[in-house]
Amino acid sequence: MTRTYAFLEMGMVYDWIVIGNGLTGSAVSYELAANGQTVLLVDRHGSPQGATRFSYGGIAYWSGTTPLLKQLCQESQEQYPQLSAELDYDIQFRELDLVLTVADDDDPAAYTDRCSQYLVAPTQLSIDEALDLEPMLNRSALSGAFTTKHGNVKPEELIAGYNNAFKRLGGAIAIAQVKGFQRQGDRLTGILTDQGTFSGANVLVSNGALARSLLRDSGIHISQCFSHAELIETPPLEHQLRTIVMPMNIQRFALEATAGAPETDALWDEDGHEVVPPILDTGAVQFLDGTIRFGQISRALTDPDAVIDAAQSEQDMRDAVGYVLPELKDVTGTWHRCLVSFCGDRLPLIGPIPSTDGLHIFSGFSNPFAILPPLAKRYAAHVSGDPDDIITRLSPDRPSLKLT
């Protein structure tokens, strides 16, 4: 993917420096620029390499369960259909049928109460109805299923759309490795990189799973964790998935709640811990170009460079996905791993970091595609003079992240 970057003024003092050009950084940098701020977006890679690059791109705006999340999901559902036009870029947004599979040794009735809590309750399906929606499913692997409409984008195209619109608004992008922060007394005045020093009135950390270690190296603590997500990506295939397939009993959220609890927070400042055992959520999505991503394994390992047996992981995912979607078991594909940030209370960290003037964070999204675009818009308006109670409630200093 070829991109041209806006002119970078080395001596300029930007209103905002945004660290990280994944989904979070690309969205919030665009919204800040749209609010009239001068913005520098910094990332060590010239194209997406992290969690967004290997995401399914699923937009679960049906899945809000609290008043806050339901409101954000509703805003997201309204925002996405207009986003390609707003950005003047095809982000490949579409709505697909989502099939939530219930395993053959499980009981669909166990999920009816959970469904009633969602903003849009998934509809229960018989096995025959599930196969009508997705013929690639293995009848023997199911005791039932649920369905609802699910948004989807090509993640890399969404980033490219935000970046291109950002540059048209005068935003600048630097490919640089952030090494630390420039300070004047108790206030941050910029960042130190392998390409030099960049100055800014505010620094916004949006580099996902790497945010904690970057801040820790400067003596700053945040309660954000990460998982190692593993999946398999194929080249364009003739196989045609009609739907997005995911398990009804998604285990990743329980892993995040336990691994991100205040009681385990200190472990994340030490390498070598497996905070909770790994899980495997069997799912798959096919993009418009024919490529398929399926998996996924999630591991709560505190070392971002932890050694993982890729061959065994790939076999485990192929076996699991091959049971539910047999045609995918032996397709050509490559194992990938990325780091996925999260917070134990399933809400992101947004706002100023206490004790360090000029330093802010926008990170830790557990369900990013569903809630991030409206929060990026709200945050940019909030820091541009339009106070927002929702942004205030997502402070990195909020009580739900602390031991009681």
Residue ranges of each PLM-predicted region?
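Dinucleotide-binding Rossmann-like beta1-alpha1 core, especially the glycine-rich loop
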Residues: 57-133, 279-282
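Flavin (FAD/FMN) cofactor-binding core of flavoprotein oxidoreductases
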Residues: 129-132, 152, 301-303, 307-371, ...
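Short beta-strand to alpha-helix junction loop
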Residues: 71-72, 100-108, 145-164, 307-313, ...
